[in-house]
From Swiss-Prot:
One Pfam family cited in the UniProt record for this chain: LIM
This protein's name: Lipoma-preferred partner homolog
Biased composition (Polar residues): 32-41, 207-226
Source species: Gallus gallus (Chicken)
Subcellular location: Nucleus; Cytoplasm; Cell junction
Length: 604
């Protein structure tokens, strides 16, 4: 609760100043924009058949017929073409319609059949190559087979460079059922013919695709590895190249490895890392058959199935295919090799204590452990319970002699014989065992202090106690903590009146000295300029109310007019009108001004 501050105006006609409040508004932060990016679906590519040039390279220079040339045969199949008459005659082409002017007298029937046979042979070689090779194996550029045709073609800008396959980016290698748009080898394909009167088309490389691309999002390389089938063999010949794939390298599955323990080879380059994970693979799809690598398979590490270190067996899939460990591990003593199911240890057998005379029994562990051996065996709660049960049964079957007093709580041995034991803290001890926990002095017949079932002599117990921050003596009884220190209750007093502050509110000055509330206000409270007494809170209050005027402090009851003694306040005509440093009311202020004016006029 703050005190009122009453400051008198300098003149009666002076208006009271008004403090305007300024409200600052902090501009709110703009909402963040969210950009959502979606993955575009790849376009679907279809087989494209390039238009054939109008010029016929097989036409004689003096002939008049316009026949489209057949596609050039591949380089690999040029050796198979021996002569024109070596091919079987094609079926009649009565249903083929041509939109060009043909001169039947230009070529013989045998020449026409030879031209069609060459085209059929080219298509046959293409289909045979499609069935025997990987769809993503790059084909050798067949530029030599069309050099003669490109050299004699008039008005062309790009020569026919051969058959090129369509490259589909960002797709995984697929070795599956081929979906080809070409017809069977026994059916000739219709030949597209350019009509007369149109512009001459520019010849482009004849492109074809081995499989239709499904309209699916591109495969993500970072996918979970599918479990390969051990009996699956990839179609076609097995290439010898495997490893990391480059932009221009063919994809091939690795060859079969010997049945020895081998490491799993990643098909993609992998940088140095700290945790090995199986290489990413592609999920199996209905229309594609994935050719897995013939390597050893290992699932990713899961905490509940064992680790990859030498002390744990890796998790193996339960199948007829024998999977060998990916990493050779050294077996420890008493542990099954990795990959084999380790049966739990045999049931614990307990060796009973020997039946002897009342001889001191040694606490020993006669239980074989099923886990790994350790240098410091520790009792589990159930083992300790069984051990005590056996001891009790042994004591019941072998009652002690008349001099038996019990079992020592310190060493666990029997206390036998008169004068060899003592009783303390409701327990039995040997005389030699009942000693101080710090100085090991015998405590029989001596005063001791029991702390948590442990015995201490008086000097050692006192040394463990806290000391009072005032008298520096150990606190034997109740401890009073304040300001982070420990005190005796009678040492925690006010520095002014020396009264004990046990249970009484107190405060601390800047020097850390403890004061009661009254003495603190008497020492540090502001003084009234009229009565010179400290301005303290009213009885029962915690806050101090004072009046500040002319840079001076006043009690509420001491803020009065110096001439008439009237109580000043903030009411109308009751305020303070100071004059020459005096606290005056309005009436007394006017009277003093008139007296001073009259005196000045008489002096003149």
């Amino acid at each position: 609760m703050s005190h009122p501050s009453w400051l008198p105006p300098k003149s009666t006609n002076e208006p009271v100043g008004h403090v305007t409040a300024r409200m600052e508004t902090t501009h709110a932060f703009g909402t963040p924009s969210i950009s959502v990016s979606t993955q575009q679906t790849p376009k679907k590519f279809a087989p494209v058949v390039a238009p054939k040039p109008k010029y016929n390279p097989y036409k004689q220079p003096g002939g008049d017929g316009d026949f489209l040339p057949p596609p050039p045969p591949p380089v690999d199949d040029l050796g198979n073409i021996t002569s024109q008459g070596a091919f079987p005659p094609p079926p009649p082409l009565d249903d083929v319609a041509f939109n060009v002017q043909v001169n039947p007298g230009g070529k013989t029937l045998e020449e026409r059949r030879s031209s069609l046979d060459a085209e059929i042979d080219s298509l046959t070689s293409i289909l045979a190559d499609l069935e025997s090779s990987s769809p993503y194996k790059p084909r050798i550029q067949q530029g030599s087979g069309t050099s003669s045709s490109a050299a004699t073609t008039p008005s062309v800008s790009t020569p026919v460079t051969g058959h090129k396959r369509m490259i589909i980016p960002n797709q995984p290698p697929l070795t599956a059922t081929k979906k080809s748009t070409a017809k069977g080898p026994g059916q000739p394909a219709p030949i597209p013919v350019t009509p007369i009167g149109t512009l001459k088309p520019q010849p482009v490389p004849a492109s074809y695709t081995t499989a239709s691309t499904p309209s699916r999002p591109t495969f993500n390389v970072q996918v979970r590895t599918a479990q390969p089938s051990p009996h699956y063999q990839p179609p076609g010949p097995q290439p010898t190249h495997y490893g990391s794939l480059g932009p221009g390298q063919p994809y091939a599955a690795p060859p079969a490895r010997p049945p020895g323990a081998q490491q799993y080879g990643s098909p993609q380059p992998r940088g140095p890392d700290y945790g090995y994970a199986p290489p990413p693979a592609r999920p199996s799809e209905p229309s594609y058959g994935y050719a897995p690598q013939q390597g050893r398979y290992q699932d990713p590490y899961y905490g509940g199935y064992g680790g990859r270190n030498g002390s744990e067996a890796p998790y193996m899939p339960q199948s007829t295919w024998k999977v060998e460990p990916a990493y050779p591990s050294s077996n420890t003593v008493g542990q099954a090799p990795p990959g084999m199911y380790q049966h739990p240890g045999p049931k614990k057998t307990y060796i009973t204590d020997p039946v002897l005379a009342p001889q001191p029994l040694q606490q020993k562990s006669g239980y074989p452990s099923s886990g790994p051996t350790s240098s410091t065996p520790a009792f589990r709660p159930e083992d300790e319970l069984e051990h005590l049960t056996k001891k009790m049964l042994y004591d019941m079957e072998n009652p002690p002699s008349d001099d038996y007093f019990g079992r020592c709580a310190r060493c666990g041995e029997n206390v036998v014989g008169e004068g060899t034991g003592c009783t303390a803290m409701d327990q039995v001890f040997h005389v030699e065992c009942f000693t101080c926990m710090m100085c090991n002095n015998k405590l029989r017949g001596q005063p001791f202090y029991a702390v948590e079932k442990k015995a201490y002599c008086e000097p050692c117990y006192i040394n463990t106690l806290e000391q009072c921050s005032v008298c520096a003596k150990p606190i034997m009884e109740r401890i009073l903590r304040a300001t982070g220190k420990a005190y005796h209750p009678h040492c925690f007093t006010c520095v002014m009146c020396h009264r004990s502050l046990d249970g009484i509110p107190f405060t601390v000055d800047a020097g850390g000295n403890i004061h009661c509330i009254e003495d603190f206000h008497k020492k540090f409270a502001p003084r009234c300029s009229v009565c010179k007494e400290p301005i303290m809170p009213a009885p029962g209050q915690e806050e101090t109310v004072r009046i500040v005027a002319l840079d001076r402090d006043f009690h509420v009851q001491c803020y009065r007019c110096e001439d008439c003694g009237g109580l000043l306040s903030e009411g109308d005509n009751q305020g303070c009108y100071p004059l020459d440093g005096h606290i005056l009311c309005k009436t007394c202020n006017s009277a003093r001004i008139q007296a001073l004016t009259a005196k000045a006029s008489t002096d003149l």
